[in-house]
Every structure is written in C-alpha cells, then in structure tokens.
Regions:
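N-terminal, positively charged nucleic-acid-binding surface of large information/translation enzymes
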Residues: 1-175
C-alpha cells in the first residue's frame, strides 16, 4: 500500500515564521518539507526525509502541499464560482449572477426570491438601469454567495502582520 502525504503549509504560521526569520514563506515551507540548509546555515532534516526514515511506503507523486499554486488554484477557482453566483429560492439552487442581472434589467428586484441581505430596498428595472455601475455592484454584493464586508482586523504594528483571533487575549497579542 502506498500512502499519499499532504502538508497544510499555507497561512499565518508559515508567514509569521518567515517574518521572524527574515525569509520568504515559500522558502521556509519548502525547506521544512524537503530539508536542506537554510540561509542561517542550519541543517533542516525536512518532513519528507523523516517520514522516509520511518519506513512507510509513501507515494511522493501523490504529495499535496496547500502552499503549491497547483493546489490553491482550485480553492481560488471555487471562491470565484461562489462570488459569481446567487441563491435562487424559487429554483432552490445557486445560479449565475448574470441571471440576476437579467432579472433586474427586466423587472427590478420585486419578484426576486433570493438569499440575500435583509436591508435591500426595492427597485424597478428603470431604477436599476439608472444606477451607476458602482451602485449596481454594491447591490449585487448583497446577493452574492460570497461577499466583501468591513470587519475588524487584529493588526499588530510591532510584528507588521495581521493576527488570528486565537492569538489575541484581552485585546493584546499573545506573541
């Protein structure tokens, strides 16, 4: 039996380590997985070497790294699909945002039965056509399956990075 192997190697811990050591996250991640000598001259064994020494039969051709563009391009693609969709309660499925725009152009939003923000003002087809492109985009954001929103960010000026919620205790960085 050949076992696949994967590394969840994308995100704040990898970025934080790179900031602390003054190295690019791609370099530190690759070094941690493959091993070698880092910029400080330290020998890094690497996860792959350690796993090979255990004696398991890993199929390295099936290795997955979440930091690899071949992996995360699929995640990005999924979010684009979600962003370009809205949920039509009448058909009980997600549909292309283009169908919603067509409905707005023909009838406004009076007959739209969608999962959306609660505070959407009714508008007619004439209203829709008179809205600026920016106004139309703001309205569409209220219907999209994924959306942009203002939110609080835990910025740490001392570290020069955003901190995850679990790194904040009583409003102060744990680091």
């Amino acid at each position: 039996v050949l076992h696949p192997q994967g590394y969840d190697s994308f995100g704040l811990p990898a970025e934080q380590y790179a900031i602390q050591t003054g190295q690019h996250p791609a370099d530190t991640t690759r070094m941690n997985i493959e091993g070698g000598v880092d910029k400080s001259g330290n020998t890094i064994q690497g996860y792959r070497n350690q796993l090979d020494r255990i004696g398991f039969s890993f199929d390295w051709s099936r290795e997955v790294r979440t930091s690899n563009p071949d992996y995360y391009k699929h995640t990005q693609w999924i979010f684009i699909q979600l962003f370009e969709s809205w949920y039509n309660k009448n058909s009980d499925k997600a549909e292309s945002i283009c169908t919603l725009i067509q409905e707005f152009e023909k009838n406004g939003n009076a007959k739209v039965n969608a999962v959306c923000d609660d505070n959407i003002a009714p508008f007619s087809a004439e209203d829709w056509k008179s809205f600026s492109s920016e106004q139309q985009q703001k309205i569409l954001l209220q219907y999209r399956l994924t959306y942009l929103a203002e939110t609080e960010v835990n910025w740490c000026a001392a570290l020069g990075t955003v901190l995850a919620n679990d790194e904040i205790v009583n409003g102060v960085s744990e680091r």
